[in-house]
């Protein structure tokens, strides 16, 4: 009896935990744990409930989060019933589990085939059309009722949410709304409010007009802009009631949706058998880090709709589809220590030392923890077991504790670990900063960034050598690098071995001096760079490569940049108030002004060919499909020719550059009368543009 009461208490504890996680995930767009930790906990609950169902009444079992989808709707949007339940998907973590799922379908239809595509980590949305017009847009909600976010869906680009379609029958389609990774990075959302692209997409899509979320002032400014909706993209994958439209398979339904102008994932396949399914899953797994959107597994569907009714469903998921999850990206290890480091902007990052463990083919001994709130939320405890995950990052991230603890046993760091200055919290309260402009670590990291590959690309100035130069008093700022040539004797003296004093006569024989001469040559070459590289190298908070390139269109040198009215960039080129404020703060700072004064004396010969005014662009390009070179290379060629590049096909697009496996952009271009060109025609256009 005592054992039964303990098991019942454990089940109740797991239910409460999952209910809390569901509320934060579905309603607050603020997931408390990683998906893999959530899935493991849910599976533990399901197993305990199966083995101990007799401990609960039928009503209690039906109320368990293991039997429900989503969470209770708490927003101010209209609550609308779904035409058919918007179910979740059951999960498989191995080939054996996938085979077990497919067995029932093969028993019903021996020639069954399957349809496989990536599982997009976004926000589920159901669209309704009457007489070709979009009339309703429902979120998943609790699976039975959803929120009607039509007012916001209408603001999304037509390419991703068609407002009118060439089809007059009543139609319902379901898909996923997301923000791609490069857009998310350029928006500098980071940990200001949204932890990842999914949270950002949900926050924008579910924004209520008269409701301001409780976030920092900068994020509120960002969220209040109507233009935010242009960042949302989509993939559609479900045609509801396909028999009404005489569609017999998932493969045919995808083609049907594509022909109507809906975005469908081009990375998909109809598979003849499970062997084909397993092979395609392996391909997706290998390529997922190169996709520009997050996926949290693969969806495998029975292709033939004719057996869906016989396959049936539970209250939570259909038996006609399953989500295959990549579990080998998670590992269990011991958290040994946590320590703080300071970046070039003064931001504090918490780092974890862990017991070495093999993850995704490499041995891992450290992991990253974004901020102290992250440590608090996960209730991480030193010298206890934790889960770590690797998802494209070089350093993996701790995503949860193996065991439950009431709170963390690690105290927040209050002083800078390098200069001991008191740390200051950001407006959001999530991040901490060292605001001492003379902090040696901030100075070091600024110079490291200045010399990095995407900035001035001075390979001979790696972090260890910069540390040595700072220690010996040879430099104190990034600009000092350009005057090292005037300090050769001092360099010889301060970097020489005390037991073997170097002189000018024997300097040429020294490998160390040869290395220094190589460094000086690299520094000279760094004077002949694209202007955007120097802008990026300045290390202005929130200004990445994309923003730096755009700024170089409005200013051709430092003097012009310093006198630029940054408010002119508002609502242009994805420049929101956060970036504008960062630019103004940077150029109003006295220490930064001294650095810029120094850099203006260096004698740069900028190679940039970007237009100073985007409106003077001679042509506008979009790209679809796989080309012979990386896409970034074509974007560079387009911009340097004086043309403009856009991710989407719009009425203002002049040319669509077409590669292999092109997506739905080709149909959009044809309908809009946009000229479609291949690579040979593209380079001819670029060549001819230089003659005019």
Curated annotation (Swiss-Prot):
Disulfide bond annotation, renumbered to this chain: none
Lineage of the species this protein comes from: Bacteria, Bacillati, Mycoplasmatota, Mycoplasmoidales, Metamycoplasmataceae
Gene3D superfamilies given in the database record: 5' to 3' exonuclease, C-terminal subdomain (1.10.150.20), BRCT domain (3.40.50.10190), DNA ligase/mRNA capping enzyme (3.30.470.30), Helix hairpin bin (1.10.287.610), Nucleic acid-binding proteins (2.40.50.140)
Its EC number(s): 6.5.1.2
Residues engaged in binding NAD(+): 35-39, 88-89, 117, 140, 176, 301, 325
Domain of life: Bacteria
Transmembrane parts of this sequence: none
Coiled-coil intervals, chain numbering: none
Catalysed reactions listed for this entry: NAD(+) + (deoxyribonucleotide)n-3'-hydroxyl + 5'-phospho-(deoxyribonucleotide)m = (deoxyribonucleotide)n+m + AMP + beta-nicotinamide D-nucleotide
CDD domains, sorted: BRCT_DNA_ligase_like (cd17748), LIGANc (cd00114)
Entry cofactors: Mg(2+); Mn(2+)
Residues covered by the BRCT domain: 611-692
Molecular function terms from GO: DNA ligase (NAD+) activity; metal ion binding
Record keywords, A-Z: DNA damage, DNA repair, DNA replication, Ligase, Magnesium, Manganese, Metal-binding, NAD, Zinc
UniProt-recorded name of the protein: DNA ligase
Active site: 119
Source species of the chain: Mesomycoplasma hyopneumoniae (strain 7448) (Mycoplasma hyopneumoniae)
Annotated residues for binding of Zn(2+): 416, 419, 434, 439
SMART domains assigned to the protein according to its UniProt record, in alphabetical order: BRCT, LIGANc
Protein's GO biological process: DNA repair; DNA replication
InterPro entries registered for this protein in UniProt: BRCT_dom, BRCT_dom_sf, DisA/LigA_HHH, DNA_ligase, DNA_ligase_AS, DNAligase_adenylation, DNAligase_N, NA-bd_OB-fold
HAMAP family in the record: DNA_ligase_A
